[in-house]
Amino acid sequence: MVKLSIVLTPQFLSHDQGQLTKELQQHVKSVTCPCEYLRKVINTLADHHHRGTDFGGSPWLHVIIAFPTSYKVVITLWIVYLWVSLLKTIFWSRNGHDGSTDVQQRAWRSNRRRQEGLRSICMHTKKRVSSFRGNKIGLKDVITLRRHVETKVRAKIRKRKVTTKINHHDKINGKRKTARKQKMFQRAQELRRRAEDYHKCKIPPSARKALCNWVRMAAAEHRHSSGLPYWPYLTAETLKNRMGHQPPPPTQQHSITDNSLSLKTPPECVLTPLPPSADDNLKTPPECVLTPLPPSADDNLKTPPECLLTPLPPSADDNLKTPPECLLTPLPPSADDNLKTPPECLLTPLPPSAPPSAPPSADDNLKTRAECLLHPLPPSADDNLKTPSERQLTPLPPSAPPSADDNIKTPAERLRGPLPPSADDNLKTPSERQLTPLPPSAPPSADDNIKTPAFHPQRMIISRHLPSVSSLPFHPQLHSQQMIISRYLLSVCGFRFHHQPMIISRHLPSVSSLPFHPQLHPQQMIISRHLPSVCGGRFHPQRMIISRHLPSVSSLPFHPQLHPQQMIISRHLPSVCGGRFHPQRMIISRHLPSVSSLPFHPQLHPQQMIISRHLPSVCGGRFHPQRMIISRHLPSVSSLPFHPQLHPQQMIISRHLPSVCGERLRGPLPPSADDNLKTPSERQLTPLPPSAPPSADDNIKTPAERLRGPLPPSADDNLKTPSERQLTPLPPSAPPSADDNIKTPAERLRGPLPPSADDNLKTPSERQLTPLPPSAPPSADDNIKTPAERLRGPLPPSADDNLKTPPLATQEAEAEKPRKPKRQRAAEMEPPPEPKRRRVGDVEPSRKPKRRRAADVEPSSPEPKRRRVGDVEPSRKPKRRRAADVEPSSPEPKRRRVGDVEPSRKPKRRRAADVEPSLPEPKRRRLS
């Protein structure tokens, strides 16, 4: 049996790795029975032992395994292992270790031979101190740590004392530090720096590496902010040597010793060009580029049109043309010759089109530009699309036999001469030619209240400031020449008409739901400026221009098989979404809010449709015009269901039309039972014939603007004409009723009102300059007085005289006298009531108290318990005090001299004249 006894003293534990291995080998050699296995374990101890393992690690376990029979060695080694672990736990925070991870420990093991030179020197003990795990811990190290803590605490206390003393001295004397105090302050600062340096020596490598990286990054960032290139992996000293710049001399008295962060050159000292660096891809600004750039792969990004003074060569994208502002030379011919000139130059007729039975071709919608056509168009199959009214100077041919639709008149602009006689004599010429009264109308019927909108006027004018045009159901079988809806159109509802051209003027809020006919070919449709939205319209123009300030153009489902010549959506257009359309040319110009839901027909070819500037909305319209112009400032035109089989010449919705709602007629109507709907008043200077008998519809009066002559008397005389024409007093009114309180406004009265029962409702106080009549007898409501601003005269006397002005001083004394009680006579006094006598049976007998038994009676108080003599505490006698301990009851009074005593003052006697009388004598009053 091999017995190994090793005494682990602190000196033995303080040995380093080599000494520990040598001593173990010497102990093994001293053993009488050598063991090759034990020697092998000891020899391999140097390879297994490292500074990161514990003192009781794997080498000691090999020794324990080699000698399993020696239980004393096992117990001794385990006790030593526990004690060493405890000591390491205690001094772990003192030796600078930060508890690194296993990855760092493996790095230390692999580099243990190169890390021998990384030890630092302690400033107090001047010994090399390792910063790795497994430091030697001895008594000197414990003493050193204790001295360091004491030094640090003393430095803090001394610094606080010196600082407090210096601050107090400066606060009192108002001076700077003296030489002696400055020296004390510097000494305290030196102690603080020494303590910081000692802590820096204890920084482990993991934290030291992070600190070095931070210093390098800070130095590089400072150099980068100074205008020098950015080198993130070079230190400040390397940067200084590489760039060849010297740091400026320190200007302060106490400069920092480690100036790695201050070795930078200010930007004002850099006067030489910088060497090339890796950041050459950061080019100079475009202000310094005076030479053209070489060609690159991004040649599709062309120069802006302001600098384009020469025409572009032909390319595959010829349909994307150059803007007209920069186009100074004509474009070369291209394959898109179907993009013709605009209709401003279209003065020549179009060639004859294919017959209606022929199938539509792809080239039918590619019309010639109107700008290049300077001669009249030849006749075509679509002769129902008439030429504009400027060329029509002859009367129209006679019309068809009379029908129910003859109420629709011909517009006045188209008539330069009188119409020939026809069967439709009830369709009169416009009011400019009519100076005679209308013939009598037909007898009234039950259907006269519901007016028929199926009429065909020659001209319909819906004037200015009309906000919206909606639900316009036009007639399906008639052909109107012209319809004009004027400026600022607020609302046009419930109309059914079919026109040739329609013009919706500027500032129209929205144009939407325009379902046009699928088989007709309009010449032109213009929706003018300021059109915010065009929604839900179904039409197919040859050219559609939506002008400036249109917010959005969306949901335009145009036909997919047609080829437009050109579509331009101009500047400041917010959105064009979901558009399916095929115009010959469509221009949506600037600042148009929205054009949406325009489902145009896929088989028709209009010449042009223009939606001009700032048109807010045109919604729900179904029409197919030859030309439609929606003019300026029209808020909305919506729900225009036009007929699908007719061809109007023109429909004009003019500028700023305010409101036309539910109106049946703007032109001269034939005579009917509804004579309350009068003709326009501009040309009618003669009185109207007598109307039909009074009916329930007579309340609907004709506007006063249309009446140039007085109306005949009717049953509705309570609805009078405006006061501008009435300068005579009103006739006497009906007998007084409950409704007389509702008076006529004063501005409508040019004469005095007749007397009525409601005279208490007087006219305003400006007309009343006379005193009011005497009031009614006094009542409880007299306290509520009339306001003072309504009274121009004094009020009459009333019973409430106690609400008067303040009484005089003499009246106040009489009012404050107590009144004597009135003496009552013996006959007037009531005798006191006599008490009522009660019978014996009515008197309740008094209840006797119930007698209680002796057992029920509780004793008054328990008897006191008898105590023994030993239980009684003797009374304590008061302690007698000595005479010296007794304080005198009160100090003796100090004797004063006669001169110190002040004599008592006698009260001053007052004269009889100075004495005020106590109360005035009461004045004697008489009995009266």
UniProtKB/Swiss-Prot annotation:
Record carries keyword Iron: no
Transmembrane annotation, as ranges: 73-93
Membrane topology: Single-pass membrane protein
Region (Disordered): 242-452, 663-928
Biased composition (Pro residues): 349-359
Keyword NADP applies: no
Extent of Basic and acidic residues compositional bias: 406-416, 698-708, 740-750, 782-792
Protein name: Nuclear pore complex-interacting protein family member B12
Organism: Homo sapiens (Human)
